[in-house]
Amino acid sequence: DRPLLGWLHRSPAEAPPRVTGLVICNPFGYEALCSHRSLRHFAEATAGLGYPSLRFDYDGTGDSAGEDLDPDRWEAWQQSVGYAIDELRRSSGVTDVCLLGVRLGATIAALAAAGRGDVAALACIAPVVNGRAWLREIRALQATMGRAEPPPEFALPEGVTESVGLLLAEEARESITRVDLAAITATPAPACLVLDRDDRPPNAAWCAQLRELGAAVDQHVLPGFVE
């Protein structure tokens, strides 16, 4: 076990007591940079309503222990969500937890929550349902930013790629490639909110699978995602 850095947003004394808290699962790379301030404000606002909120850095990312290229990244990121849930319950006294995930963070949250009995709800913003498609997307975005290859003085180790601020070893890419949320066999939470991108078809297959597994699913399109 390695320490993770987290930010616990406690509810003010005058807020009504709640039994549910929020864990925020941020995206990665450039997407994490773009969403950081909004997620911090959301955590603060949620805590102000009486729901303690926890933000954290996954294992090997940000200020948490470990490195980008450590082995077993996919499993470690999912374990990080579990640790965050446990820490929020321990630190705040809540009994139930809601997860809010953005992009790949939503994917990790969904997989980490499956099989737990203390995740009351899952909210996904533009979730990555197919890992292979997401890898293609971030490679294309890297190319459009004029950074298809790093300069020679910053050459990457063999088998390592860098896309929009995210370093991935071959093992991590292979793990992400196998991700298909539409094939999950356990529901992550009794209630799921899915906010799809407005520039892509809705994630109908995944939502149908969630309903088949017994989850109540509320699905909407999030306007202005690309902007």
Model feature map: region roles:
Residues D72, D96, R116-E227:
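The alpha/beta-hydrolase serine catalytic core
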Residues F56-D72:
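Glycine-rich "HGGG/HGxG" loop immediately N-terminal to the catalytic nucleophile
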